[in-house]
């Protein structure tokens, strides 16, 4: 091939490569704009403003998982009963399947914005409450629940009040969520709190005999312990306690443990 043909061939390849790069750039730009539109409510379902209440007939459950931005109230009663209140078009999309004794409060797959969803639950027994995201759960007035497990992943909040004869309380917080206790747990023996992130366990009123507190990150724990307090902190976490327990601590970082009463 002579020199002129080689030059023309090189120019063609260079122009074809530039054209391909432009096509890819345009495609990526369109994809980015489409994603932005989705996150900016372009493809999200919004509440229609038609507020209604509905009773749900569900299989029996003693474990509850909240996976949406909703307000949930859980109380104890002889018979199970569930009432939901909110935008009619949102309630229609609520999942109602119970699997292995657990009801996951979630909407069908999709994007949702600007809606109301309130759930009132009455159950005879409660073993586990989980929250993912920014929802709010209030648990009130339970008797004779030997073990209660609570977990938060995200920025949500779980509030507790009026528990009697609960022996063991396990709390798991991942993220910036809060567990707040407003009232004494009669007969509570053991407390196990594990915080990963900046979440808080704020429950001075909940008195316990023995507590294991593990914090990784900057979380805070406020508790009342009478006998043994085991502490593990990695980071800047803080533990403040009432009572006169024997304290065993292992701290890595700037974290601290302090008696405050």
Regions found by a protein language model. Name each.
Residues 133-135, 154-156, 175-177, 197-199, ...:
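Periodic glycine anchor positions in long extracellular repeat architectures
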Residues 93-97:
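Glycan-recognition/cleft segments
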Residues 6, 20-29, 36-91, 104, ...:
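Short acidic/polar N-terminal linker immediately downstream of export determinants
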Residues 13, 29-30:
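Short, linear, compositionally biased motifs with a strong N-terminal bias
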Residues 56-64, 76-81, 98-100, 121-129, ...:
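Short "repeat-start/strand-capping" segments in structured domains, especially the N-termini
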Residues 43, 215-216:
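A short, flexible low-complexity segment enriched in Lys/Arg and Gly/Pro that occurs
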Residues 111, 140, 165, 175, ...:
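A general structural signal for short secondary-structure boundary/capping elements
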Residues 1-17:
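Short, Lys/Arg-enriched N-terminal segments with co-localized hydrophobic residues
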């Amino acid at each position: 091939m002579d020199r002129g043909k080689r030059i023309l061939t090189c120019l063609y390849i260079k122009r074809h490569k530039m054209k391909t790069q432009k096509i890819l750039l345009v495609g990526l730009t369109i994809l980015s704009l489409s994603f932005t539109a989705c996150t900016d409510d372009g493809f999200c379902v919004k509440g229609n403003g038609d507020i209604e209440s509905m009773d749900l007939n569900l299989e029996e459950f003693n474990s509850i998982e909240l996976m949406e931005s909703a307000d949930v109230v859980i109380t104890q009663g002889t018979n199970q009963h569930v009432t939901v209140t909110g935008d009619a078009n949102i309630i229609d999309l609520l999942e109602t399947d119970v699997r292995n004794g657990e009801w996951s409060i979630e909407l069908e797959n999709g994007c949702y914005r600007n809606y109301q969803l309130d759930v009132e639950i009455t159950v005879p027994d409660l073993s586990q409450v989980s929250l993912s995201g920014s929802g709010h759960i209030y648990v009130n007035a339970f008797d004779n629940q030997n073990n209660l497990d609570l977990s938060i992943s995200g920025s949500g909040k779980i509030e507790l009040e009026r528990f009697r004869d609960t022996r063991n309380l396990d709390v798991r917080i991942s993220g910036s969520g809060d567990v707040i206790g407003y009232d004494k747990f009669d007969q509570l023996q053991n407390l196990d709190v594990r915080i990963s992130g900046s979440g808080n366990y704020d429950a001075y009123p909940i008195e316990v005999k023995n507590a294991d507190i593990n914090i990784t990150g900057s979380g805070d724990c406020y508790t009342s312990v009478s006998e043994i307090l085991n502490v593990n902190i990695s980071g800047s976490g803080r533990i403040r306690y009432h009572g006169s327990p024997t304290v065993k601590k292992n701290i890595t970082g700037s974290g601290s443990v302090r008696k405050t009463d």
